Design a protein with these regions (language model features):
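Phosphate/pyrophosphate-binding loop motifs in nucleotide- or prenyl diphosphate-using proteins
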Residues: 1-178
Length: 178
């Protein structure tokens, strides 16, 4: 069976309930941004596995868990009857944030994204999460409410993971100066 269906050639796509919808609809933009984030996280995971100086297998696992969550969020957004344990996932992220926070030097200034390429890509992923969060709010839908705390914490987690990669690789954080 070919990957192409030709159904989208006229600017429409189908939701999981087979409802046809414009490809420029806010919900399709939201799901497209989730896909973009998922691909960026794939770049981050691949990059983490290429680092020889340190073992980042735990970070790869964290990233892949997030990728799985994003598929669920996107599926639910377009009508799939899946469950997402938002409170549990937020709690898991908060625990991971706390773990990284204990390992890192206290931050006293804003930092510019950069350092190691993997850290820079984690920062890029963080900005994609913020975009998705704004899109979820703009959808103004009850179905988005459980995802908002998850997305909010997720950007914090990716920020700390970027800092952690730089810290472990002894890359200097670039302090923002006015």
């Amino acid at each position: 069976m070919p990957i192409y269906t030709k159904e989208g050639d006229k600017g429409y796509t189908s939701l999981s309930n087979n409802q046809k919808i414009n490809k420029d609809s806010p919900i399709i933009n939201f799901v497209g941004s989730l896909d973009e984030l998922n691909a960026m996280l794939g770049v981050c995971a691949a990059s983490l596995t290429e680092i020889d100086e340190e073992d980042f297998s735990t970070e790869v696992e964290v990233v892949q868990d997030i990728q799985r969550d994003l598929f669920i969020v996107g599926s639910i957004a377009v009508g799939a009857k899946l469950k997402f344990a938002a409170e549990k996932e937020v709690s898991n992220i908060e625990k991971t944030i706390d773990d990284y926070s204990r390992l890192l030097p206290k931050l006293k200034n804003f930092v510019l994204p950069g350092g190691d390429i993997t850290a820079a890509n984690l920062h890029l992923a963080r900005t994609l999460v913020r975009k998705i969060e704004r899109q979820a709010v703009a959808l103004n839908s009850k179905s988005m409410e459980p995802f908002l705390p998850y997305l909010n914490r997720l950007s914090d987690l990716l920020f700390l993971m970027a800092r952690y990669v730089n810290y472990k690789l002894k890359k200097q954080e670039i302090i923002w100066k006015t």
